[in-house]
Amino acid sequence: MDKFADLNYTLSVITLMNDTLHSIIQDPGMAYFPYIASVLTVLFTLHKASIPTMKIALKTSKCSYKVIKCCIVTIINTLLKLAGYKEQVTTKDEIEQQMDRIVKEMRRQLEMIDKLTTREIEQVELLKRIHDNLIIKPVDVIDMSKEFNQKNIKTLDEWESGKNPYEPLEVTASM
């Protein structure tokens, strides 16, 4: 376990890999050498990082299958990103989580639509009642008996003495 965390050991392994590649490939001007070295470096780093992580995870976890599956999916996704692909590998658990999230969002939107349509129906009913109250109903004969200013009006025949009490009798002028 000490060798896994030892930086000198890691650097010496990388140097050994580079020396081996240089000895195998005699032509130093080869165009693919940097790419091969990069891929081997990434693979070596993944190897060094994943083995201790897997050992610790398997010892501490109760469900080793899920841990292994998660580690493999992560490694494959890393390799796909390094290769330039934008697609990712997903597990069934992730797909189910995304589907649950989508279904919850759809339910929330349906509830919102239901609330909005209920409010709109209530508003339309209220507007109809207001419209019905505001409609002018035509009346053929106007009944003026209920008007307050028409109650005490008397005709000439109804007056006691037969003459208009509001007409002045004499005209007097002040001097």
Curated annotation (Swiss-Prot):
Ca(2+) binds at E120, Q123. The keyword Transferase does not apply. Pfam families: Rota_NSP4 (PF01452). GO terms for biological process: monoatomic ion transmembrane transport; symbiont-mediated activation of host autophagy; viral process. The chain crosses the membrane at residues 29-51. The keyword Iron does not apply. One of its GO terms (molecular function) is channel activity. The N-glycosyl content is primarily Man(9)GlcNAc, with a small amount of Man(8)GlcNAc. Glycans are attached at N8, N18. Keywords: Activation of host autophagy by virus, Calcium, Enterotoxin, Glycoprotein, Host endoplasmic reticulum, Host membrane, Host-virus interaction, Ion channel, Ion transport, Membrane, Metal-binding, Secreted, Signal-anchor, Toxin, Transmembrane, Transmembrane helix, Transport, Viral ion channel, Virulence. Residues 52-175 are cytoplasmic. One of its GO terms (cellular component) is host caveola. Its main location: host cell. Residues 1-28 are lumenal. Belongs to the rotavirus NSP4 family. Homotetramer. Interacts with the immature particle in the viroplasm. Interacts with host CAV1, early and late in infection. Interacts with host integrin ITGA1/ITGB1 heterodimer. Interacts with host integrin ITGA2/ITGB1 heterodimer. Interaction with microtubules blocks trafficking to the Golgi apparatus. This is Non-structural glycoprotein 4. It comes from Rotavirus A (isolate RVA/Human/United States/WI61/1983/G9P1A[8]).
